[in-house]
């Protein structure tokens, strides 16, 4: 018989789990729940087979080998102590109200929120203290809007995103090739494919926890948000969730690469770093690369790649041709085509932070007047646009000006502009389907966190700053000021009520807040007075939008487009 502080649960498609009871919060937590296994490095994962006996789900499971995050927000409570295991880290954590588990008839299942972490497809896991959802779920109970939160792992860095002709040839020559589906023959997209398996696990098993398998809200930040965008527009990934909250990330921020170009260049660089001769046969290269220990492989990537990308694969995960068959598939074009979006997608809450770029500017080298021309070129590859960029964003006169202007350019290039583009696309989707079939809401995070500015002056509402507010995780809650804690609870209320699709009523309050009219350019705004108000959704001026539109058109017109 289970001890008083644990609880046993039998899944519909799996086995029996033993989780932990938190009676103070009235929740149960099941950690290290396996949803898939990896048969070997650089192969598609397979669903976890049912097991006999009781599986211990009281402790955090292993994670994919990775370095600590280099982003400021994650330094508030860095992940420490988790085991690395590239083959057995596809696990998830489930945070569930005890009341949902006691609902034996499962007659009134509750909404589910599945979290996909960010980290540039290079780091991140469900072990990050930032994503501990115990307080989030407790608050949902207090609001009488109980939800289940699921946090997932997926393969990152070269374990989840690596592509080359050698990987392709080795798979094609392998004994298992003929038994694999066309989809599972994809290379370079294992991280996205892992996510798909996790969402499928939720659909198949969450009813056992008292969750509604037909009311799943996916939410993610940065690469996690970009992942959700991929799932929305890739036909092979449709049907995974019903609603989505996209936080600071779209396909445009992390577009797919090509096997023969960017993928091959990264692969060759990795081999050179590991002293594997490029003159060897594909089979011998792969034999040597597979023999490299997971930590040695991680170390080899440390100075080589800061960001990973999915990879175009000629009709496996990514379509080979556009929907009308007239041209090669280009996801940057598909992302603006409302026909491409998942037909079961019912709503999206879309937003970003005001000062996204302050977290990234230091990664580009010195930000000073001497470096300004080269800094500008990294974001604006066409010299004929330099004058327009300086007219729109300003000409720096001091080193401080360079830091400020460059941070703004980074934020707009990577986040504000793409959020604007996708916001316009989803608004067209709402108009085409009707607001009763699809609804778009917008938010803007315009306030920072006092503790972050103490760590690094000038961060402001930097990339990822909303995460401590949304999760209110135990290791971070003590860092809040009183006003920040109040805002955290209000943001949790908005996120939770979105999962219930009851934001009209849930956001009504004595101060007269109402649901923003997105078609009129409105959004929920988390202000620097630590309140949620209605404000303008678009962060860009008309001149800034025109500048980025022109740059995007020039990129699409070049022969180097990602096809």
Per-range role (PLM):
Residues 77-81, 184-189, 252-258, 275, ...:
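Active-site rim elements
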Residues 103-106, 123-129, 160-165, 229-231, ...:
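Short, solvent-exposed loop/turn and secondary-structure capping segments
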Residues 197, 204, 208, 233, ...:
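Substrate-access "cap/lid" subdomains that shape
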Residues 209-221:
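Alpha/beta-hydrolase fold nucleophile elbow
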Residues 220-230:
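Glycine-rich nucleophile elbow surrounding the catalytic serine of serine-hydrolase chemistry
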Residues 416-420, 424-563:
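Mobile gating loops/cap/lid regions near enzyme active sites that modulate substrate access
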